[in-house]
Amino acid sequence: MKAVTATNATTAEDLNQRGLDLLAGGAAPEAAEAFRAAIAVDCAHIEAHHGLVRALRDAGRLEQSIAAALALTALTPADPLAHTALSISLQRAGHVPQAEAAAARARVLEWKIQLQSPPEQAGPGESLQNLSLPIQGTVP
């Protein structure tokens, strides 16, 4: 298979897409190289960082996946998905306490995002009033 470099595809997005295609095709080691090439072109390409974490994990390179996930959390410290990716890699590598801590951090970040979101337009109880559930069977 042809080596993935910045000369084979000119943009980080092209390289990222190549990595996604390789990952979907089961070629995790090659996908990792494509994601690394995308990051070399644009170090702030968040999707490529996420892809690299996944590709390394799928390739069984768990410690490298953890390192890539830590780099991602440093790049995007308020991103719950980055902390979730770190948690998954840590868990797969057997670092359960650290995985649980990363998962807890992801939950806290998600809650913060939810709290900053505008409340729903419906008043209290309105969402339940409009809820319709299919009734199965009959009630005696």
Residue ranges and their predicted role:
Residues 1-14, 139:
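TPR-adjacent "capping" and linker segments in tetratricopeptide-repeat scaffold/adaptor proteins
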Residues 25-37, 59-71, 93-105:
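Structural signature of tandem alpha-helical TPR/SEL1-like repeats
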Residues 41, 74-75, 108-109, 113:
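Structural marker of alpha-solenoid helical repeat scaffolds
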